[in-house]
Design a protein with these regions (language model features):
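Phosphate- and other anionic-substrate recognition elements at nucleic-acid/protein interfaces
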Residues: 1-274
Length: 274
């Protein structure tokens, strides 16, 4: 049996494909965390070792720069004194100082009023200054945008028709309305692909075998999940190659949740042993 286990999220949607093997063994086929907000653009600056690739901080004309390489671009790095909102609140004497500092031509025309000087400085910054790259917030994404992104990401799973079972974390919190909607979107996507073996499972299941009824905080459960995952990988010949991947990943907890959820499902069906 091959299953796809999904830990629901917007910025951190964790997916893990697990296939059962002979002798009650299992193998992880695919494992990742998907950002439905879209990946943050990376720095395009060409270094001696190739393209930088670090997280971008600024951009201009669809070219992205990290904080370090922005200083090597032909454009100005944004400063607080040049922010449009701040300029409109600045005294005319200070505006004249800014114009002089950046050699902004105001034609020596003393008849220009504050609004006209401000517009000249803003025009200058629009042409000469880098623009900050804004981080896409999950809270600002509407469900249609999330649905489009979800579809595009799941379409990348070219072998999805070979998956026998979908296991999705059940969203039960009264404050998780958006997550409940996304859970439904995920299920509907697979239903429309004629994959209808879909189970919604409680998030509490994945650690039951390891901690029983022990009372723990959310943070403690996350930490325990990561440690258990690493321990399972280290002791499993078929999957120990995944250990460096997990150890280096920024979202170890979400990776762990998707794996442990899938393993719980397979153990519950008496298809594997750990």
């Amino acid at each position: 049996m091959k299953i796809l286990s999904i830990d629901v999220g917007i910025k951190n949607l964790a997916c893990c494909i697990i296939e059962t093997k002979p002798d009650m063994m299992f193998k992880i086929e695919k494992w990742e965390v998907i950002n439905l907000c879209g990946e943050h653009p990376t720095c395009c600056f060409n270094t001696k070792k190739g393209i930088c690739g670090n997280k971008s901080k600024y951009c201009k004309n669809d070219i992205y720069y990290c904080r370090i390489h922005s200083k090597k671009s032909e454009f100005l790095v944004p400063t607080s004194e040049l922010l449009k909102i701040k300029l409109k609140r600045t005294k005319i004497s200070t505006l004249l100082e800014i114009a002089k500092k950046y050699d902004i031509n105001i034609n020596g025309d003393k008849s220009l009023n504050k609004s006209q000087i401000t517009e000249k400085i803003i025009k200058y910054t629009d042409e000469k200054m880098l623009e900050p790259v804004k981080e896409q917030s999950a809270n600002n994404m509407n469900l249609v945008s999330i649905g489009i992104s979800l579809k595009n990401e799941l379409e990348k799973y070219s072998d999805i028709q070979n998956v026998d079972q979908i296991v999705i974390e059940n969203q039960i919190s009264p404050i998780a309305n958006r997550m409940k909607s996304i859970q439904g979107m995920i299920a509907q996507y697979f239903i429309m692909k004629d994959i209808t073996n879909i189970d919604f499972v409680s998030s509490s299941n994945k650690l039951k075998e390891f901690i029983g009824d022990q009372k723990t905080t959310y943070a403690e459960r996350k930490k325990i999940g990561v440690n258990i995952t690493k321990d399972i990988l280290a002791k499993n010949q078929l999957n120990m190659d995944w250990l460096p991947f997990v150890s280096k990943h920024k979202k170890k907890d979400d990776l762990a949740d998707s794996l442990l959820q899938g393993l719980w499902f397979l153990r519950n069906k008496k298809l594997i042993k750990i």
